[in-house]
Structure formats: structure tokens, C-alpha cells
Swiss-Prot record:
Protein name: Putative F-box protein At1g50880
Pfam families, alphabetized: F-box (PF00646), FBA_3 (PF08268)
SMART domains given in the database record: FBOX (SM00256)
InterPro entries, alphabetized: F-box-assoc_dom_typ3, F-box-like_dom_sf, F-box_dom
Parts of the chain that traverse the membrane: none
Domain F-box positions: 19-69
Length: 279
């Protein structure tokens, strides 16, 4: 008992000494130290002390000391033979049009459990999506809210007193030319976007819009795992760049993972945002 008490007091003194040494460091010095760490290390450092957690969660610290830490990546999923493969590709607007890369690929065996992509990031969630078709003309107009490229707005049907919520998904509706009126500097500007094409073929024939980069580029990924590449289309400049993914879906890939024919394997994508901002 006496030895346990001595050991307990020794541990308490050690913790007290470490806490006092950390508290003696000025806040500005601590902020500069944390700012030199990568985002993952800063998130882990929040568990060190309340002071470090308070500094690393402060919006001023995140916006000023970590202006370039928030980054987006494109997650690509495909599931042949009950195996889930996930590819994470960081969005880099400075890449040339044709690049051969070997992206990181994670294999999740058949399991009903939820898998984490990163220890500190969000889980893979399956969000149910419902679609309803409404007949008749809508009347009136109202303010809308855009969430992840989907515009939600309130409307009502003829001879009905019930309000409904409509949605307009740009990623699925962008099959024809679109005219947008944008308010900039207290002036309405008309912007006309024509349907994009690649090698004289509409991009929609290759795939739908899978997301938008931070620079406003539309992301196109093929529906099936064939000639695996990603197209980034800039609607302002009407130009595109292509990123080829090598080492995915070829003969070596299939042999290495014990897979057969990859024809017809559908691809699913979503954007992932890494940021220090707390939810």
C-alpha cells in the first residue's frame, strides 16, 4: 500500500510539473508552435491541455495561422466482389492536363461496421435520397438555400394550400445550357454556361458532375472503371484538364487483389473537406 501511495504521489507531482511548465509558455509562443504543426498533430494536441484546445479551436487562430490547412479531396469508391475500395485524390489546380499518378487506395473487407477514413475525420455515411415528381405549374417565388450544389426552395401547387420544398440538383440537371444571373457589386450580371464537351463528346455522356473544386472547376469521373481518368472543366475559361489514374483497374491491380473482370463496376464519388474548424 505504501509503495502504491508513493507511486501515485510521484505521478501527481510529475503531472503538476508538466502543467506548470506548459502554463509558463506565453500564449503567442504556444500559438506559433501549434501553427508549425500539421493539421493532424494540432487536432491531437487538443487533448494535451485545455489551453491548447482553446487555442487550436479559436476561429482567429484557424483563419490566420492556418490559412492553407483546409483542403478538399475527391473520394472515389468502387466495390467489386464484396470488397470496398476507396481512393483519396487531393485537388490540385496546378497539375498539368495529363498526369499519371498512383493514388492511395484503402481496402475494406466485407463488414457491416462503419469504417473511418481518417482517425479525426468524419465517417462514411449512406444518406438516403428521395425524389418526387410534381405535376402542374408552381406559383410564386421565394428565397432558396444552396447546399452542396443542390438548390432548395419553397413553392406551392395550383389549387393547393400546402407549401412544398423543391430541389434542383445542378449535378444532374446540367445537361443543357444554363443562364445564371449573379449579383456582384450591387449589379446583376448575366452568365451563360454552355454544355461542355471533351473530344467532341458531351461530358455528361462520360459521367455526371461529381463535384466542384475550390477554384470553381466541375469534376467529371467515369461511371464505370474503364480508362480511369478524371476531367476538370472550367466553365469560365471553357477549358479542361485531365488526370489519369494509373495502377487502378488494370491487370496487375486485378491480380494483386484477387479480382476478375472489372467491366461494369460502377464508381461512386464524393468530396471530402479537411479543416480545423469544429462542427
Amino acid at each position: 500500500m505504501e509503495q502504491q501511495e508513493k507511486k501515485k504521489r510521484k505521478i501527481q507531482r510529475s503531472i503538476s510539473t508538466q502543467s506548470s511548465s506548459m502554463s509558463s509558455i506565453p500564449l503567442d509562443v504556444t500559438s506559433k508552435i501549434l501553427a508549425k504543426l500539421p493539421a493532424k498533430s494540432v487536432l491531437r494536441a487538443r487533448c494535451v491541455s485545455k489551453q491548447w484546445s482553446s487555442i487550436s479551436t479559436d476561429p482567429y487562430f484557424i483563419s490566420n495561422m492556418f490559412p492553407k490547412q483546409s483542403s478538399s479531396s475527391l473520394l472515389i469508391f468502387f466495390k467489386p466482389k464484396r470488397k470496398l475500395f476507396v481512393i483519396s485524390i487531393h485537388q490540385n489546380p496546378n497539375e498539368p492536363q495529363h498526369v499519371g499518378i498512383c493514388p492511395r487506395l484503402d481496402l475494406f473487407p466485407n463488414s457491416k461496421k462503419t469504417h473511418y477514413l481518417e482517425p479525426y475525420l468524419e465517417k462514411i455515411l449512406n444518406l438516403a435520397q428521395t425524389q418526387k415528381q410534381l405535376e402542374g405549374n408552381t406559383i410564386g417565388d421565394n428565397d432558396g438555400q444552396c447546399i452542396n450544389g443542390v438548390l432548395y426552395y419553397r413553392a406551392s401547387l395550383d389549387q393547393s394550400n400546402v407549401d412544398i420544398i423543391m430541389s434542383f440538383d445542378v449535378s444532374t440537371m446540367y445537361n443543357k445550357d444554363i443562364t445564371l444571373w449573379v449579383l456582384e457589386d450591387a449589379k446583376w450580371l448575366c452568365k451563360h454556361f454552355t454544355r461542355a464537351s471533351y473530344n467532341d463528346q458531351p461530358l455528361q455522356a462520360l459521367s455526371g458532375i461529381n463535384g466542384i473544386t475550390d477554384d470553381g472547376e466541375f469534376i467529371y469521373v467515369a461511371y464505370v472503371l474503364d480508362s480511369f481518368y478524371i476531367l476538370y472543366y472550367d466553365p469560365e475559361k471553357k477549358s479542361y484538364r485531365r488526370v489519369d489514374l494509373q495502377g487502378v483497374g488494370d491487370a496487375d491491380f486485378m491480380l494483386r487483389n484477387g479480382l476478375g473482370n472489372m467491366d461494369g463496376i460502377r464508381i461512386h464519388t464524393c468530396l471530402n473537406i479537411e479543416s480545423l474548424l469544429s462542427l
